[in-house]
């Protein structure tokens, strides 16, 4: 693979400031996604489990081929849209491998 040369100075004050600002945004996104991936809150998840049900992300994980990746498509759906939290708009959507085949996966999240 050929190398693409750049005139960007990674030591310049502008580059460093932009990199720091970007890192703040990346950290905020990771925090938001971690919160979303917890589902609808502790009480809702406990109620779901007490009924003998798997949590939605556990269902998706169990469906996927072991060790295969899952490309989630709509984790930020409904984020900051309503007055109350609706993690991922109550639905998990993505692309994953099931029995060796790439599949679109949809799981409703009732938590």
Question: What do the PLM-derived regions correspond to, one by one?
Answer:
Residues 1-111:
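Terminal-region recognition feature
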């Amino acid at each position: 693979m050929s190398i693409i040369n750049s005139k960007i100075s990674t030591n310049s004050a502008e580059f460093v400031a932009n990199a720091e600002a970007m890192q703040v945004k990346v950290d905020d996104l990771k925090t938001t996604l971690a919160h979303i991936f917890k589902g609808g809150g502790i009480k809702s998840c406990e109620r779901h489990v007490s009924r003998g049900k798997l949590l939605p992300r556990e269902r998706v994980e169990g469906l996927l081929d072991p060790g295969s990746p899952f490309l989630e498509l709509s984790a930020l759906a409904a984020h900051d849209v309503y007055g109350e939290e609706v993690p991922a708009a109550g639905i998990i959507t993505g692309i994953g491998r099931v029995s060796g085949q790439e599949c679109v996966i949809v799981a409703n999240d009732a938590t």
